[in-house]
Amino acid sequence: TCALPISAKGGSEALFSTSLPATCFPNGSSLACSWDVELVHQMGQALGRECQHMGVGILLGPGINIRRTPLAGRGYEYYAEDPVVSGDIAAALINGLQQEGVGASLKHFAANNSEYRRTEMDSIIEERALREIYLAGFQRAITKSQPWTVMSSYNRLNGVQTSQDPFLLTQVLRDEWGYDGLV
């Protein structure tokens, strides 16, 4: 016999039998190891075609959090500890995806360092480290690809919830980088 999982809300979204067939592409960590932006661009195009086929208008990704530890719960999803590699790989995926008419949602902006209690955690980071490590990949991806959306992270950054942070969302993202997409 097989026990099927039921969500805490009683819905069917957790049932494996309700999912649709889809291609299993390599995870973010594997993609970054290739350093092959053309291959990642082609993968973005393939993802875009699958999304179009399934009626998906915006893909909730890529995620480019900095991989601080291999033990992070979703660390496999993120590209690297290097913001240049992360930004370049993300831009390639985004450009391929959006070339097929499907938007990307670059996430989690910014300094989302843990999955454990991430809505309660506060990432305390000096501005220089924030800009050189945690924001540089986002800036690079946004400059090279203009994703349709940017998803804020769930944590606080230096005491301010990132989804309400005027420094992060207005000063940096909008004013300094010129991003005009949806947040």
Protein language model regions, located:
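Glycoside hydrolase catalytic-domain context in secreted enzymes
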Residues: 1-183
